[in-house]
Amino acid sequence: MPKIVVVGAVAGGATCASQIRRLDKESDIIIFEKDRDMSFANCALPYVIGEVVEDRRYALAYTPEKFYDRKQITVKTYHEVIAINDERQTVSVLNRKTNEQFEESYDKLILSPGASANSLGFESDITFTLRNLEDTDAIDQFIKANQVDKVLVVGAGYVSLEVLENLYERGLHPTLIHRSDKINKLMDADMNQPILDELDKREIPYRLNEEINAINGNEITFKSGKVEHYDMIIEGVGTHPNSKFIESSNIKLDRKGFIPVNDKFETNVPNIYAIGDIATSHYRHVDLPASVPLAWGAHRAASIVAEQIAGNDTIEFKGFLGNNIVKFFDYTFASVGVKPNELKQFDYKMVEVTQGAHANYYPGNSPLHLRVYYDTSNRQILRAAAVGKEGADKRIDVLSMAMMNQLTVDELTEFEVAYAPPYSHPKDLINMIGYKAK
């Protein structure tokens, strides 16, 4: 009976194991997870902190016991894979509760260890990061136990913005700092102005080009020379792949610690796959490498690997489009395609439209800003971005589908909109992009 070992039990690992079991009732499947919880919703964590998700149990899909009862898959939490011997096809496992080490053999190995939050490295009892449910519980308990009021949020990416919003909605008083003036880097810089407007509207302090120099108890000294007091600090300064344990194997890593994979999510070593935040692949619509550590990619990779292990040799990954979205108070920011800093590799033109998200005479209308970049050689879409209080998600998903099917910007005139006054226009923003491009 084949043995399948999975490293990591969150989005990629648990999903892949579950999909394998759906297709293969016989194989022995075991998952090693180094942390306390399995199969939790990473994307829910800021909303658990903000008490938007009122019961944290809603963010936890399975326990190991429930997973085994439903799927006959063994999950061992607090078990960390610390080394891989790909020649013997074994992994070395550390039981983090007992410090016992043992070896486990495999026929197929699926690596989905995820990523860890970067830290600024200050020794402080008031500093936290947010990556898993344990972090979420620690933050929530600290807030309650210490009557936290003033919170410093460091960083201005998706996680930091979501955390800041949820702290504010919880009734706390957050302040945002970021080490540069470039915030929310997946969006075009000039389309991020509503983030600052939303902060100003709520009188939430923020400082760009600012960093922490020292932490002494609750006293924070900044690069600017300011000295302020905070009850708590939450760092959102990026992540790094959990690939240290892979270095002793023959598995190839790139310079950033990611595992390059082929279109079957195979590594360079036979019988070993990599999925989720640790894997890097390529874009679907252009010939560039792409690392997209988001939920859709982990779930798609999990399904592809499961199909292959179950015997479908023809299924392949066609590449990322990098579709992403974030809510920040009243606004939605969404984009798809190459990153802003990758556009310089193309000869491109940009076309944009700003108009109401739905018919102007229908109540509640607000501006929606839609922007599309296209390749001048073939007029296919390279990137699109949308910002507004409504309708950004709808338009970016339509453009994602257009890119998936290699439509040109001109063909957007033929997009048949689902029109009624509360939703759109007879000639929608997407149509207008096509007309303006001509």
UniProtKB/Swiss-Prot annotation:
FAD binds at residues 8-33, 267-277, 419. One of its GO terms (molecular function) is flavin adenine dinucleotide binding. Substrate binds at residues 15, 19, 22, 39, 42, 71, 299, 427. Gene3D superfamilies: 3.30.390.30, FAD/NAD(P)-binding domain (3.50.50.60). InterPro entries: CoA_disulphide_reductase, CoA_disulphide_reductase_staph, FAD-bd_OxRdtase, FAD/NAD-bd_sf, FAD/NAD-binding_dom, FAD/NAD-linked_Rdtase_dimer_sf, Pyr_nucl-diS_OxRdtase_dimer. Its cofactor is FAD. It holds the Pfam family Pyr_redox_dim. Keywords: FAD, Flavoprotein, NADP, Oxidoreductase, Redox-active center. The keyword Oxidoreductase applies. It catalyses: NADP(+) + 2 CoA = CoA-disulfide + NADPH + H(+). Its EC number is 1.8.1.14. Transmembrane segments: none annotated. It comes from the Bacteria. The active site is at residue 43. The keyword NADP applies. NADP(+) binds at residues 151-166. Binds 1 FAD per subunit. Belongs to the class-III pyridine nucleotide-disulfide oxidoreductase family. Contains 2 FAD binding domains and a single NADPH binding domain. Catalyzes specifically the NADPH-dependent reduction of coenzyme A disulfide. Homodimer. Reduction of disulfides occurs by a thiol-disulfide exchange reaction, but involves only a single catalytic cysteine residue that forms a stable mixed disulfide with CoA during catalysis. This is Coenzyme A disulfide reductase.
